[in-house]
A protein has these predicted regions:
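Core catalytic DNA strand-manipulation module of type IA topoisomerases
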Residues: 1-240
Length: 240
């Protein structure tokens, strides 16, 4: 929706003050066991029933920091501004996704050789949408765009190692490598949280594994400060 990190935090704070979402200044993506016990009741309050057992991939006491992940409180929202309604619906949608069944896919990667060259072909078959069905498969469509080299099929072929196949047709196309995409505020926030991820040296990357730039409460402000000092600037949805 194009919200800046600073605006997102401000809206989240407003939702918290209205008591319809939990504490916003958290870096955790997990909830504790005691909060998990309240999830079925929270789902009923927001009008959603999921089949049991609920998905537990977001439940981990060890990964909960001072505050757990942002979730709805179950209070009925009223008199929300447009931006507040957008962010609230995002929180609710992600909450439902988190406890929905896993998405199941079958993937295949095949390497062919003509004796000189080696070619790679990748394909995927969706078995069940699972949590992706919450937004009617929008995530599945996003996944397709992320891996343009992967062919989406309704069924995968049965192939055996060493099998000889006949060449039916061949085309030569030219491609160019692409640079890494520009940062968005979302990817920049992630990079700040995981500051050592791009470090190539193993020892340095491991040393920085638990380090980050700023905290969930200060990262948005750090970005705004850099913009005010003309070190970086916004260009549509990108940061340059």
């Amino acid at each position: 929706h194009g919200f800046s990190a600073d605006k997102t935090l401000s809206i989240a704070q407003s939702l918290y003050e209205k008591k319809i979402t939990t504490y916003p200044r958290t870096g955790s993506r997990y909830i504790s066991e005691d909060v998990f016990e309240e999830v079925p009741a929270l789902l009923r309050k927001i009008g959603k029933t999921l089949s049991n057992p609920l998905n537990r991939h977001s439940v981990d006491n060890a990964k909960v920091t001072d505050h757990h992940a942002i979730i709805p409180t179950g209070e009925t929202p009223s008199s929300l501004l447009a931006d507040e309604a957008i962010l609230y619906n995002m929180v609710v949608t992600r909450f439902i996704e988190a406890f929905s069944p896993d998405s199941e896919e079958e993937r295949m990667q095949v390497r062919f050789t003509d004796g000189i060259n080696t070619f790679t072909w990748k394909a995927c078959r969706q078995i069940s949408l699972g949590w992706k069905a919450v937004q009617k498969g929008k995530e599945a469509e996003a996944d397709k765009k992320e891996d343009g080299d992967e062919q989406i099929l309704s069924s995968l072929p049965n192939l055996a190692e060493g099998e000889v196949l006949s060449l039916v047709n061949a085309d030569i196309t030219e491609h160019k490598t692409k640079p890494k995409p520009l940062y968005t505020e979302a990817t920049l926030l992630s990079a700040m949280e995981n500051a050592g991820k791009e470090v190539k040296e193993d020892d340095k990357r491991k040393a920085m594994a638990e380090c980050g730039i700023g905290t969930p409460a200060t990262r948005a402000n750090i970005i705004e400060t850099l913009i005010l000092r003309d070190y970086i600037r916004r260009d549509k949805k990108s940061i340059i």
